[in-house]
Regions:
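Hydrophobic alpha-helical transmembrane segments of polytopic membrane proteins
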Residues: 19, 106-114, 177-188, 260-298
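Generic hydrophobic transmembrane alpha-helix motif, especially the helices
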Residues: 109, 133-187, 264-266, 272
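Hydrophobic alpha-helical transmembrane segments of membrane transport/permease proteins
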Residues: 16-66, 156, 161-173
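Cytoplasmic-entry segments and transmembrane alpha-helices of multi-pass inner-membrane transporters
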Residues: 2-11, 117-153
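Transmembrane alpha-helix signature in integral membrane proteins
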Residues: 9-12, 16-17, 21, 89-120, ...
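Membrane-cytosol interface at the C-terminal ends of specific transmembrane alpha-helices
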Residues: 170-210
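An internal, D/E-rich "acidic patch" concept
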Residues: 57-115
Length: 313
């Protein structure tokens, strides 16, 4: 396991380096006004002097090396447009907590509703609970998320009794965004748990338990469900982390001051330093989620041996 994790972390670091470096280079192709708050009022000489002071006229390899050197020391530069001269890390630290809180609530809701739904669908395969649950999953996956997000906002705002501007101090303002964010993962958990339970139900140990006269409910809960959860658990950390950093549309829709709205604003205003800092954070979050998923699988099912699997290839 340790050997596998070492290899996985090494590959992840390489992937992180490639992704962020590529984005860094692409941002250097963008117009230079993204580095100046008062670009329209500046002369060409002032622009060139500013670019020289920021090191943006240096050769690209030199810029990349300097960026990574500073990033390893926790310095991602300063914002030039969104909040002039404010450290990128400080802005991220202000915006990330509310996205994390909303992501945690959305994940808990999707697990609390999605896992029981998948369990019931798997236990009653082909019967009305399975058909009803399948119809719900198909609806969620077939309809574009933006469509049901808008419907939830239009009809839910009046029902819950909230305004259009988000108020973090009032719990009612959290209801609609959290419900909207949880729908996709809810359908995902239910669909795959149902599939894994159906697969497990056809295995020999289940037939043996039935032959011994074990109650069908006990088989489903104590054997089939536990084994079906093992592959699903792998995706929970990455799904949660992706929810935290991927709620761009939801946060923009409800005016939530989180990471999603920050990314949209910085892209629209061409704040390149902020964008590359956000991309670095997103890449780190995604990679950490994948590694945590593998670790969680081993903790739940000790029979899994990634080290032996890697050695056998």
């Amino acid at each position: 396991m340790v050997q596998y994790l070492a290899k996985r972390i090494g590959r992840s670091v390489l992937t992180l380096f490639i992704i962020v470096t590529l984005v860094f280079c692409l941002l250097r192709l963008m117009p230079v006004e993204g580095y100046f708050a008062n670009y329209e009022k500046m002369s060409e000489a002032q622009i060139q002097a500013g670019l020289q002071a920021m090191g943006l006229l240096d050769p690209l390899p030199v810029q990349v090396g300097r960026f990574w050197k500073n990033a390893l020391h926790g310095d991602l530069g300063v914002s030039h447009i969104y909040k002039v001269n404010a450290p990128v890390t400080q802005i991220l630290a202000q915006k990330l907590p509310i996205s994390v809180q909303m992501g945690v609530l959305a994940m808990l809701l999707s697990l609390v509703l999605g896992i029981p739904l998948g369990l019931v669908m798997g236990q009653y395969k082909g019967r009305w609970p399975d058909k009803l649950g399948t119809a719900f999953i198909v609806l969620i996956q077939a309809v574009p998320a933006a469509v049901y997000f808008l419907y939830i906002q239009m009809y839910g705002t009046a029902a819950v009794g909230v305004g259009l501007l988000f108020n973090a101090a009032d719990w009612r303002y959290w209801v609609l965004p959290v419900c909207s964010m949880s729908l996709a993962n809810l359908a995902f958990y239910a669909m795959w748990l149902r599939r894994y339970m159906v697969d497990e139900s056809n295995k020999d140990y289940v037939r043996l338990a039935r032959a011994k006269g074990v109650c069908g409910r006990d088989i489903a809960l104590h054997h089939v469900f536990r084994n079906a959860m093992v592959p699903l658990v792998q995706y929970i950390p990455s799904a949660f982390l992706n929810t935290v950093v991927g709620s761009i549309y939801i946060e923009s829709l409800y005016s939530i001051p989180g990471m999603g709205g920050l990314l949209v604003t910085c892209v629209q205003r061409h704040d390149n330093t902020m964008v590359q800092g956000i991309v670095l954070l997103y890449a780190c979050v995604g990679i950490v989620g994948l590694i945590l998923g593998d670790i969680l699988m081993v903790l739940i099912d000790p029979r899994i041996n990634f080290g032996r699997k890697e050695g056998g290839r």
